[in-house]
């Protein structure tokens, strides 16, 4: 009989572990946070100039420093951003992008429009 009692406790613990495992299983798919960089321009013409620079092979951080109206000194690095901490269109785009590097960036094309202006977004990490 004692094994059943242990099994009962184990089952309860197992359910809790199962819930934690479910949360962990969901994390790699969409993640709850992204390490993001962006280039923000108020004017569409300026963001398209920045896009052309990126397409010609200029590093994302350099283009951000030259063109972005936000966080330019950090090369557009916003750090880790969690779900719910970003405006809707920015968040949707950030979580849809694959993780990429400065050497081979994958960014939003066309730029994403928010109340702040036009963003070119790239994601460097996901957790």
Swiss-Prot record:
It is an enzyme of class 5 (isomerase). GO terms for biological process: rRNA processing. Keywords: Cytoplasm, Cytoskeleton, DNA-binding, Isomerase, Nucleus, Rotamase. It catalyses: [protein]-peptidylproline (omega=180) = [protein]-peptidylproline (omega=0). It comes from the Eukaryota. Its EC number is 5.2.1.8. May be involved as a ribosomal RNA processing factor in ribosome biogenesis. Binds to DNA. This is Peptidyl-prolyl cis-trans isomerase NIMA-interacting 4. It comes from Xenopus tropicalis. The gene is pin4.
């Amino acid at each position: 009989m004692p094994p059943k009692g242990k099994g009962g406790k184990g089952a309860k613990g197992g359910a809790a572990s199962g819930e934690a495992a479910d949360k962990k299983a969901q994390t790699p798919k969409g993640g709850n946070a992204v390490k993001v960089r962006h280039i923000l321009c108020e004017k569409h013409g300026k963001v398209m100039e920045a896009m052309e620079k990126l397409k010609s092979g200029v590093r994302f951080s350099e283009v951000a420093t030259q063109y972005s109206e936000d966080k330019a000194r950090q090369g557009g690095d916003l750090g880790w951003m969690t779900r719910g901490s970003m405006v809707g269109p920015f968040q949707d785009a950030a979580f849809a992008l694959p993780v990429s590097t400065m050497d081979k960036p994958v960014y939003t094309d066309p730029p994403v429009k928010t109340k702040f202006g036009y963003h070119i977004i790239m994601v460097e990490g996901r957790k």
